[in-house]
Design a protein with these regions (language model features):
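Phosphate/nucleotide-binding beta-alpha loop and adjacent structural elements of enzyme active sites
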Residues: 1-272
């Protein structure tokens, strides 16, 4: 079934995940880092996978518990995934939407938006809970994605697909460089978000796949006679549409030809 038939937009995370599934990818374990109130397209696209939801904001726990009860095989952890285990300070926004980590522990308990929380690494938790690969990992942790990935270098060896929220005004190129160092290539860009001040592109969800993995078996743009024929037909129509646009909007106006009267020549005069 095509994505047009399902009504799923190709340039969304749902569309990207559905495409991965249509291409034969079935992760054994799906890891949702920064689960918040749930990433439903992960759970709905891969209902038979084992799901691990990691979320640092304790106020979201009741909702994650409801989600996990409905999934075939799922569990959640209230903790922060980062580059090393321990205890970190979480600074939570008043709306419980965003948070940030600090290595300094809280000593003043009067601020309800600052709290100490346990920190884990993905490598450790997967080993501890015997979570099998291949993995699909989604990371959305408000700018600290690199720390999460740094704590996952072992399981990245068994990971085919990684989705990372990146910002064009922050860590985008650092994430791309790190993923390349781990043998991954950029695969997809979805869910574009524009900042309201000037409509500049602010952040995107970026998918990475193994350079030598499942999604890089084909290197050409089109394969097979039918694909090439369809491509050539598309390119021909594309060219014709350009020519039509040029003829309509950029051609010089056609000037009418001058009217020439017929002349009658007499013996001593000319009648026009």
């Amino acid at each position: 079934m095509s994505q047009q038939q399902t009504g799923t937009l190709r340039n969304s995370m749902s569309g990207s995940l559905l495409l991965a599934k249509q291409l034969g990818f079935e992760p054994k374990t799906v890891i949702d880092v920064g689960a918040a109130l749930g990433t439903f397209n992960l759970y709905e696209t891969f209902p038979d996978s084992r799901h691990l939801l990691i979320e640092p904001i304790a106020e979201n726990e009741p909702y994650l518990a409801k989600i996990c009860r409905k999934l075939k095989s799922a569990e959640y952890i209230i903790a922060a995934a980062t580059k090393e285990s321990g205890v970190f300070t979480l600074n939570v926004s008043p709306g419980m939407v965003h948070s940030s980590l600090s290595e300094n522990r809280v000593t003043d308990s009067s601020n309800p938006y600052l709290r100490n929380i346990p920190a884990i690494t993905l490598d450790e938790i997967c080993k501890e809970r015997n979570l099998p690969g291949p993995y699909l990992i989604k990371v959305d942790v408000d700018g600290q994605e690199l720390d999460v990935l740094a704590g996952a270098t072992e399981i990245l060896q068994q990971t085919e697909y990684v989705i990372v929220e990146v910002t064009l005004f922050g860590q985008m190129y650092d994430v791309m460089s790190f993923m390349k160092s781990q043998g991954f290539a950029a695969y997809d860009i979805v869910d574009l978000s524009y900042r309201p001040t000037d409509q500049a592109l602010w952040q995107v969800d970026m998918a990475f796949v193994k350079e030598s993995g499942h999604f890089r078996r084909e290197r050409g743009f089109a394969t097979g006679e039918q694909d090439i024929e369809a491509l050539n037909s598309h390119l021909k129509a594309y060219r014709e549409s350009f020519i039509k646009h040029i003829d309509t909007h950029y051609s010089d106006p056609v000037e009418p030809e001058p009217q020439v009267s017929q002349a009658v020549v007499g013996e001593d005069y000319v009648i026009i």
